[in-house]
């Protein structure tokens, strides 16, 4: 797989735009990693005009913004479906700190088959809270990813 289209939630074109659930005030730059990761998938495989701005607007209009957090997991499947793409949830519980989880093998198999994987990362190497990233290649112990909050391409461990 070649590198997918890359978007940053902190891009000045949309970073300061509203991405707030009822009762909060936040922005795409602070909380829009999920729709930004999905925008990368959609712009790569379906419609190059899709941006984090358009995906955050769609997620907000359908109630997928979680108050005081980011985006509900349930957003991704319908977001893909409206462009004729299939999305599958591999896991819905935490596997934080579980190096031998079967979900790691499922994600690796998906990458080996040329699929993109949106992963929700817990506190650790890449984030201090929850954060969605787009995995697009695995080479040895190096994961190549598009992180909506970073320009760094490859991570190990």
Where do the language-model regions lie?
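Conserved active-site-adjacent core of cysteine acyl-enzyme catalytic domains
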Residues: 43-157
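Active-site-adjacent structural segments surrounding the nucleophilic cysteine of cysteine proteases
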Residues: 1-69
């Amino acid at each position: 797989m070649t590198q997918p289209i890359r978007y940053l939630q902190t891009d000045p074109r949309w970073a300061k735009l509203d991405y707030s659930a009822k009762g909060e005030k936040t922005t795409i730059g602070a909380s829009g990693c999920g729709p930004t990761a999905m925008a990368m998938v959609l712009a790569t495989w379906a419609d190059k005009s899709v941006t984090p701005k358009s995906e955050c607007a769609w997620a907000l209009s359908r109630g997928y913004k979680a108050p005081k957090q980011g985006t509900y997991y349930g957003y991704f499947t319908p977001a893909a479906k409206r462009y004729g793409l299939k999305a599958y949830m591999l896991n819905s519980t935490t596997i934080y700190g579980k190096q031998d989880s079967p979900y790691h093998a499922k994600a690796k198999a998906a990458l080996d088959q040329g699929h993109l994987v949106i992963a929700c990362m817990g506190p650790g190497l890449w984030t201090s809270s929850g954060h969605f990233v787009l995995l697009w290649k695995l080479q040895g112990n190096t994961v190549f990813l598009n992180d909506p909050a970073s320009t760094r391409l490859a991570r190990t461990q």
